[in-house]
A protein has these predicted regions:
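Acidic, low-complexity intrinsically disordered tails
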Residues: 2-14, 27, 413-433, 762-785
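Structural detector for short beta-strands of small beta-barrel domains
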Residues: 17-32, 68, 658-662
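Short aromatic-glycine-enriched beta-strand elements
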Residues: 30-42, 667-673
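Accessory alpha-helical DNA-binding modules that contact the DNA backbone or grooves
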Residues: 37-45, 50-51, 59-287, 343, ...
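Pre-P-loop entry segment of helicase/translocase ATPase cores
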Residues: 167, 236-237, 281-340, 412-413
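ASCE P-loop NTPase helicase motor core
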Residues: 339-342, 347-540
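Conserved helicase motor core of P-loop NTPases
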Residues: 473-651
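C-terminal accessory regions
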Residues: 647-650, 655-785
């Protein structure tokens, strides 16, 4: 049927009433730039209609025809839900004037639009496109402004055409804008000939997106472009699994599997990629293949570490006197290893302090701080996560912050781009703008990956002291590298390992029990037994370490619910949300995904007062405990005081940060999350894949955190996951109470299993190589003599 401004067609009984509208876009109320979901006001013969739907390319002032349904939204009232729409080219003077005056063309407002259309009438658009110099005939338009209007008008048309073209390949609005800005009109050629080029040039375009486009335009599976891009993608995927390089045989096998070609096809392209400096190949006992940015990042990290590593000649007796003074002031007695650590920071500019739980790392850090303060040195404390930084502040009494915040992460941060390029442009603090301090102390160093270490070192000047603290027996960082272990293994730095257990005091949160029970911390004791490969004590006679034998999944689930909801909150004097379930796996009946569904049902059941949002893998509900599962360096956060006023703000929420959903707003399509009871963050619905429920998390994700009470289900699972390091890391996350539920034999099997997956890194090798080069070349060699 022909379109009038508004009419409806009655459907069969029980179906929605289809309606047709035609009118001007008065203004855009809301738009989600990731998926194009838009709420707009449409002027239909002078009446305003609220229209919702996917309009990624629509601007104020445009004339559109729509087909859709009238619906009554429970919160926002009547609105028109678009099914299909069409942009109608302005075909009368009023339409042209309205479009030009809508703000769609920069520098043209309603008054100027009226003068332009009055002058050129129905020829207005033709003049702008074909004779733009004639715009200068209109009062208020210079020749320069005429050219600017024409360029803006043309770019608007070209961008819309490009974005609609790209949307046909499944590319969202935000990404389409990036592609258009990067390539302009050349994007059509690139899409048709080599869409894989976008993976090199544009953050957010990965191999899978490019590969889907390539299939649609008919590029074959054995294309050189495809294989080269696929090899780099395989190396980047390995990077996300923690590897800095891959052995050639594994790279060829993995890439061949991903691409559906043979390993020989992969190997044929490696030399070409090396010549183009995309990869670096090193021949040794095994042939190593690196993505070039990661190779140079590892080499530069090693060089910067060695450049910072300076030995000072100090009076040992003076340090001894200082230690004695600290002991007297603080009413403590340092163990010999703790004294050794304070001597170390007096003599060496890089010191590694390592040790398990309860070995006195915090006491030692405090002693170091007192020594540095006596020397008049400025000190900065930092940790990889907000939780770890908060614990560091509480333990030392000195302000600690995340490493990202110390390095002043900027709003343009893009880690994916930086990893591809091998730089750290996301931080304001760098070689050109270094940190102004004398000493940096980093805690939870096992979580620091190669990228973050490289960025930190770039922001340090020679003469700055670096103390790194961590437990080398925990799992390595989620990101690439194994920095702490590699630094220790290299033998190039002063390492002090604390091995005497001090934390045996009675934990104050527990009520007094039978005097016959051991008053020591069995969490600490058993953690050290696990590290040594010895059986743990499972007699349940302690106040903080419990084991409950259960033989099937349903029994384990029942006990988990009982412990978290009913038993432990009163025993440890915390809220159920402060009790953390840690599991080795993501999948399976006792994996993260299933456990979160179960615990959500019992800890935060449905309620008329709680709004919900369905997502691809379940739903979020107001009051849910959630975790950020990928780094987002651009997202903004605010801290508010009790009166609701903003007292601080910044950018960045990081992998592993936990919070509570405080609001779900269907109108703005945003979810509000409160992290660490301080930082408020709003997530567009399109970004909800960055969050997941966190009643249960993997042990790996828990690293760097500490919880009042931890519950761990250990029943059965693959040997590659159920190993000693994983168990040790999980046990050491518990501060006041740990309960393991499951099979005793599997627990003992984990203690004996030391076969954790190898991480392919060569930082230790680089440190040895560069240090040996420096020793072999004397001062004359350095001068080229």
């Amino acid at each position: 049927p022909g379109l009038n401004s508004r009419y409806t067609v009655d459907q069969k009984k029980g179906e929605k009433t289809m309606a047709y509208l035609k009118g001007y876009v008065d203004h855009i109320r809301f738009r989600n730039e990731d998926n194009g979901y838009t709420v707009l006001s449409l002027d239909v013969d002078g009446d305003e209609e609220t229209v919702v739907g996917l309009f990624p390319f629509l601007n104020d002032g445009e004339y559109i025809s729509l087909e859709g349904d009238y619906v009554d939204h429970p919160v926002h009232g009547p609105q028109f839900q678009m099914r299909t729409y069409e942009i109608v080219a302005p075909d009368d003077i009023d339409s042209m004037e309205r479009y030009l005056g809508s703000g769609a063309i920069k520098g043209v407002g309603p008054a100027l639009a009226k003068r332009i259309t009055k002058k050129f009438k129905m020829d207005t658009f033709r003049v702008i496109e074909e004779e733009p110099e004639r715009l200068a005939e209109v009062k208020g338009i210079s020749e320069k402004k005429a050219r600017a209007i024409a360029v803006e008008f043309s770019e608007k048309q070209e961008m819309r055409q490009a974005m609609m073209f790209l949307s046909g390949y499944g590319i969202n609005n935000n990404l389409a804008v990036k592609i258009y800005k990067e390539y302009g009109d050349h994007l059509y050629t690139i899409i048709q000939e080599n869409p894989y080029k976008m993976t090199d040039d544009i953050a957010g375009v990965g191999f899978k997106i490019a590969d889907e486009i390539a299939k649609k335009v008919g590029i074959g599976s054995s294309s050189d472009y495809r294989i080269i891009s696929g090899i780099f993608y395989t190396l980047m995927r390995a990077l996300n699994e923690g590897h800095v390089f891959l052995p050639k045989r594994i790279l060829c096998r993995n890439a061949a599997h991903i691409l559906g070609v043979t390993p020989e096809d992969i190997e044929e392209h490696l030399l070409e990629m090396m010549i183009d400096r995309k990869i670096v190949i090193e021949e040794d006992e095994e042939t190593r293949v690196y993505a070039a940015p990661q190779y140079h990042m590892e080499v530069n990290t090693a060089r910067m570490l060695l450049d910072l590593n300076i030995h000072y000649d100090v009076s040992i007796s003076e340090v001894e006197t200082m230690i004695a003074m600290i002991e007297e002031t603080e009413q403590i007695t340092f163990a010999e290893k703790q004294k050794e650590a304070i001597h170390a920071v007096a003599q060496d500019s890089i010191v590694v302090l390592t040790g398990g739980p309860g070995t006195g790392k915090t006491t030692t850090i405090n002693g170091m701080i007192q020594y540095f303060e006596h020397e008049g040195l400025d000190i900065r404390l930092a940790a990889p996560t907000g939780r770890a930084a908060k614990r560091m502040t509480e333990a030392t009494g000195y302000e600690a912050m995340t490493i990202h915040r110390m390095l002043e992460i900027n709003g343009e941060a893009d880690r994916e781009r930086d990893m591809k390029k091998g730089n750290a442009s996301m931080f304001e603090r760098n070689a050109g703008n270094p940190l102004e301090t004398d000493v940096i102390i980093i805690d939870e160093m096992s979580m620091v990956d190669l990228y973050l270490m490289n960025a930190l070192l770039q922001a340090m000047v020679p003469g700055t002291r670096l103390v790194i603290v961590g437990d080398a027996n925990q799992l390595p960082s989620i990101g690439a590298g194994n920095v702490l272990k590699d630094m220790i293994a290299s033998g190039q730095f002063k390492v002090v390992e604390l091995n005497q257990i001090f934390r045996q005091e009675l934990l104050h949160v527990y009520e007094q029990k039978s005097k016959s029970r051991d008053e020591g911390s069995h969490i600490v004791r058993n953690a050290h037994l696990i590290h040594q490969g010895r059986p743990v004590e499972l007699d349940n006679k302690s106040r903080d370490f419990f084991f409950l034998q259960r033989n099937n999944i349903q029994d384990v689930l029942g006990v988990l619910v009982y412990l978290v909801r009913d038993k432990l909150p009163g025993y440890v004097h915390v809220k159920p949300y402060d009790i953390q379930i840690l599991t080795p796996m993501r999948k399976g009946e006792l994996g993260v995904e299933r456990l979160n569904q179960v615990m959500q049902q019992y800890l935060n059941p449905p309620s008329d007062e709680k709004k919900e949002k369905e997502i691809a893998f379940g739903l979020f509900r107001e009051g849910d405990k959630v975790m950020q599962i990928k780094n987002n360096y651009q997202i903004e956060w605010e801290m508010r005081n009790s009166k609701g006023f903003t007292v601080d703000k910044g950018v960045g929420v990081f992998n592993g940060d936990m919070g509570i959903i405080t609001e779900i707003n269907d109108y703005t399509e945003k979810i509000t999350v409160l992290f660490d009871e301080t930082r408020e963050v709003q997530y567009p619905y399109a970004s909800l894949d960055e969050l997941e429920l966190a009643y249960a998390v993997t042990i790996h994700k828990s690293q760097g955190s500490e919880y009042p009470a931890v519950v761990m289900p250990i029943l059965s699972g693959p040997r590659v996951l159920f190993h000693r390091n994983l168990l040790y890391t999980g046990v050491t996350r518990a501060k006041n109470c740990l309960t393991i539920v499951g099979d005793r034999n599997m627990l003992f099997s984990m203690i004996q299993n030391v076969n954790e997956q190898r991480r392919y890194t060569t930082l230790a090798l680089r440190l040895d190589q560069i240090a040996n080069e420096s020793e072999e070349s004397g001062p004359m060699d350095d001068l080229g003599i």
